[in-house]
Amino acid sequence: MSGEKVVKILCNRFGFTVSGYSGSHVRLSKADKGMKVGTVVPMHDELKPGTLHGILRLAKIDPEEFFRHL
């Protein structure tokens, strides 16, 4: 799965917004129950499974819930 697709799913389905760019990485954030939640997504053609799980962990999203939106 590409970084671009992950960003689209996080923004369209989970309410994240792009808060910045740094080289080939995109910072995403959202306010969740009074807390600010954020993650960084590398814009690679193919993300490794461990990288994707790390992104979801930082975003506080259950991987099963994320994969339901594919």
Give the positions of each predicted feature.
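Basic nucleic-acid-binding interfaces
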Residues: 1-21, 27-70
